[in-house]
């Protein structure tokens, strides 16, 4: 029987140690905290819309398992990335267990609660800053901060659960569609969502207290 490099008993401990090194939202992966839209905007270094073009995985020289994602950026609401750019980042964890040269199996797959990335999917992502010690990166709020776009509708892996809970914006700043969206459940109109996020960032609503 092949050896498993991280056993069933040791895996939670090894995972917790690795996530602690990543910092930011990854450090809370073992106890995923619900975050709403205001928190996702505030915690993100960049907010991008685009398409996933490549997904691979590997093990870094320091032994850290990663999934490498390349995206084509269509638009950006926050940060230095611009439409037309290609962006590549690495997220903690493998796509699937990997057979190592010594015959053991590295079972450090992407942890539950992290976003999944698939070639061809369109998305809006609230990207947290890269971890200072490892360079690994994921989304603010983990899977809450990556929303897939399909047939003009947008939702995250939790069907937008809690995304608008507690979000407060003066009615005078909102369109009728935006007011309806903030009180809705499940997938919402992608154009309305992206438009609201863009105006919130451009208008600096969170810093001015207009969005809470």
Question: Which sequence ranges carry the predicted segments?
Answer:
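Short aromatic-glycine-enriched beta-strand elements
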Residues: 59-71
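Bacterial N-terminal signal peptides
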Residues: 12-23
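Conserved hydrophobic positions within beta-strands
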Residues: 50-52
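Beta-strand/loop nucleic-acid-binding surfaces
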Residues: 84-111
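Netrin-like (NTR/C345C) domain of secreted extracellular proteins
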Residues: 28, 102-212
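Bacterial N-terminal signal peptides that target proteins for export
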Residues: 2-14
